[in-house]
């Protein structure tokens, strides 16, 4: 029998193939699961027999799910979704868009050639409230509660939403963003330039890389019938 060294089998030093941020989350499937979770937890809040502790958990979950659905609908970064949710909480018309600063658009860089410092100007994008995914009655209710007040006081709200998604839906916030992008590109067949503009990319480079990775996965997963 041939002999194999550990390096042959366990090549820890081998370069990793870039897989992007996608975690194989289906847009419609995760949207349905989140909507179901939203209704379930809202029901706990409305139940007069629910304990204070049960309502506390349900209140937090309602907020996290609404933010997740808003992120999914807009294919946004989680920080953008949180800012948008806060803006919608004081909006008189949830059918109107809000404007948020695109995360990481404003930053300090070093020019590789001149070594000069470069400060990029912030860019902004529109966000819509997911009225097709979130009952506005639930949203208007939750933003008037102590659970919303406490959420707005958190130092790291992004981590709380992320931990909730990982623990209850086995996905992360990047998964939601790219599930939405995947749906726009591969199901609705939207133009890549339009999608890049919608999600806040400065160009289509990242989307090209993403679609190439998805296409590569499809080649690996293809079934050959003989």
Curated annotation (Swiss-Prot):
SUPFAM superfamilies: DNA breaking-rejoining enzymes. The active site is at residues 97, 174, 177, 210. The keyword Nucleus does not apply. Keywords: DNA integration, Viral genome integration, Virus entry into host cell. The keyword RNA-binding does not apply. GO terms for biological process: DNA integration; establishment of integrated proviral latency; symbiont entry into host cell; viral genome integration into host DNA. InterPro entries: DNA_brk_join_enz. Belongs to the 'phage' integrase family. May catalyze site-specific integration of viral genome into host or helper virus DNA. This is Putative integrase V10.
